[in-house]
């Protein structure tokens, strides 16, 4: 096995299954030790563990403040798209009963490159008939923040500036993401 710490684990957030496995193998100095077939089997096994873990997810697992934020955005006729690197994103939304609150769910299988490339955010904006420059992107991972910036959208980070980067609006946790806060970020961005 490969032991990882919290700091390294942050680098795995927001990247595709294959990219995260590549990063893990590189970190554990096992890069290049597996054939393509073995790598695919490892990626599948990693995903199987993850799928087993998320079977128990319920609406009670929605992060604090997210349901009220999504509801407020819907009531204000703000379009909402999911730009997750995870192919399991739609399943998670279903388990948490959030799917009806989204106008679009960008499929990571439909993009050339995963985060930190901007492809998924460009696709998400397109699916709600907007340009990235007309969008805010909310992310809890550095790779996601980089992807939002590269797309031309305005990022909002959830977490710590030490992990996400300097010079962008950051809230410490999802409960601080309110419609009023996002309006302020947008107005400051446009300002």
Where do the protein language model's features map onto the residues?
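Conserved SAM-binding loop
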Residues: 62, 82, 137-138
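N-terminal helical cap/lid subdomain that shapes the substrate entry/recognition surface
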Residues: 1-68, 72-76
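Asp-based, Mg2+/Mn2+-dependent phosphohydrolase catalytic module
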Residues: 67-72, 86-191
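Non-catalytic, surface-exposed connector residues within folded enzymatic/regulatory domains
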Residues: 33-36, 60, 83, 96, ...
């Amino acid at each position: 096995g490969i032991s990882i710490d919290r700091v390294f684990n942050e680098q795995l957030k927001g990247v595709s299954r294959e990219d995260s496995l590549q990063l893990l193998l590189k970190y554990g100095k096992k890069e290049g030790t597996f054939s393509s077939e073995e790598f695919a089997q490892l990626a599948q096994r990693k995903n199987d563990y993850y799928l087993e873990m998320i079977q128990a997810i319920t609406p009670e697992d929605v992060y604090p403040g997210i349901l009220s934020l999504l509801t407020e955005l819907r009531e204000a006729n703000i379009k909402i798209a999911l730009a997750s690197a995870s192919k399991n994103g739609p399943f998670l939304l279903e388990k948490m009963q959030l799917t009806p609150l989204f106008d679009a769910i960008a499929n990571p299988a439909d993009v050339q490159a995963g985060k930190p490339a901007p492809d998924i955010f460009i696709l998400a904006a397109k699916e709600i008939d907007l340009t990235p420059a007309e969008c805010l992107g909310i992310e809890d991972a550095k790779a996601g923040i980089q992807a939002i910036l590269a797309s031309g959208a305005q990022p909002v980070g959830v977490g710590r500036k030490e992990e996400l980067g300097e010079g962008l609006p950051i809230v410490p946790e999802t409960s601080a993401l309110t419609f009023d806060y996002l309006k302020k970020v947008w107005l400051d961005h446009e300002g």
